[in-house]
Amino acid sequence: MQLLDWHWLISALGDRGLMRWMTIRWNASLVNRQQLRRVFPLNTLLTLSALGWFTCFSGSTIVATDTVVVCPVALRSALQPWCEYREKQGHKLQFVVPAATAGLTRATILALPRRSQVKAILIVGDAPSYVRGDTGTKKISKPPLGSILSVEVPTFYHRAKVNVLFGSDPEIASDSHYADFDGDGRVDVALGRLPAENRQQLTQLVQRIISYEKDYANHVSKRNVHFVAGVGGFGPLADGLIDTISRRLIGGGIPESFDVSMTYASWQSPYCPAPMEFSSTTIDRFNEGGLFWVYMGHGQRYDLDVLRAPECPPLPIYRASDAAKLKVRGVPPICVFLACSTGAFDSPRASISEQMLLAPDGAIAVLAATRVTMPYAMSVMGDSMLRQAFKYRRETLGEIVLLAKQELVAIAGKSGSPNRRLLDQVAAVASPDAGLLKEERQEHSWMFNLLGDPLLKVNYPDGMRVKCAGVVTHGEKLRVTFDAPIVGAAVIEVVTQRGVLREPLIERNVDAVRATLESDRWKGYSEEYEMANDPVWVSVRREVQVGPQSVDVLVDNASSGLQIVRVVIYGKRQLVIGSARVFVAER
């Protein structure tokens, strides 16, 4: 680190500019009379010395910075392994000590030299608790915001115009304005927050972030994508549209080489296990590990929706207290909550998203909303995230969220997505706020916040091209070819299309449930659920070397129609996947 070249500063900024810069630095270092009075008198000299050090050194290096780190003094030591790890990757970090308000902290970021080269902002520390009121009053932190003992970083509050009509708080908690350099409502750089409340939580989370990127190179679970869905309850028309659009997004947005599971809180669906086992099944899916774990449905700050079934009490899908049951065995998943309020990091106690992130064996990152959400804007956001992750395979999670948010606030047609055009058309007819769709999208850009590291490198499996004949007759062999990039065990499978079941359904109706003894009432439901999530007709295993491969697969027991051929190669340090389509014809 270097001291400031004051002669350069005076010539570059002029007298007035220098005074403004010094004022911002002073505020950014959290020095103001009222705050210093709250620090114990015996610690005044220590406080001034520490603040002076951070003013002169931590925020004053004139270098090409790509990442701004907003971190309280009290958490810096716990963050140090992350800093060293990222710097070894080539990142240039600029530290900013949070001020007493989000506005002052943002002003410090805007005043940084060479700000145009900044690509990401990491906020470290929890936010003060929102109480209520038109001005976004917040509970006074202990120690006070702005002292060197505080571990909190304030957030912004935006006036709600659309979601407040449907029961939301009048203000939307959002970190987005930190990354909106020109104030146009569109984020300009990647952004994330690690909402740790103490050094221990941060130390543990930093270790897990580093482990996520360095370990799990060949873990089978990195090809998993898990979906959990609640029942809409918006009315038959809206629920039908949401179901149709969700199927389209999931079916077309995720490559067929990935293994997708669905757990649906509708007792009449084959994707619903026995109702009493639903919550544990949801947690089991998480604990399997995966690239993503996505919840779609109703939510609140501390719990998700409930499952309702005949002769059963309301059964919670997931509660914040269930975080203790998270014991992920594979790749810690990135969690996405397409639901209301689950990401309210300004809550008096840790929200469901924060608890999933901070659990010792929990999620590696969470994207969730701080307030009441709407189906249209969430669908637009989800569509864009699927494309950024699976079509373009953006390297970092921060990039995925950044580009998804930019597309969310863009006018129709800018994204080039046919799904976006469909969503806009449906919303114009079916949305209760059809005249405020632009405002709805803007509010969702604010309320969806990434709780996690924006520099996190997504742990994708590697891909390869798989080829086979377009048609095969049932009972004959299908030749599958691929160019293996690694040595390992290859598994070649013929599977159903997503949403197509291999077996006939059991009877799921109210009369059948009520006519059955309680001990046998839900018999077969969990077995059918497992079958619905097992699409494999045929599976063959071969050891392969690097280079062209050709494997013959006997296609028997498969139904006629369009099927999918999947290939997975398990190497010592890599997992490689690919897929192709084949039509199975009857004899």
Which residue stretches match the model-derived regions?
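Catalytic cores of nucleophile-dependent amide-cleaving enzymes
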Residues: V153-R208, R301, V306-G382
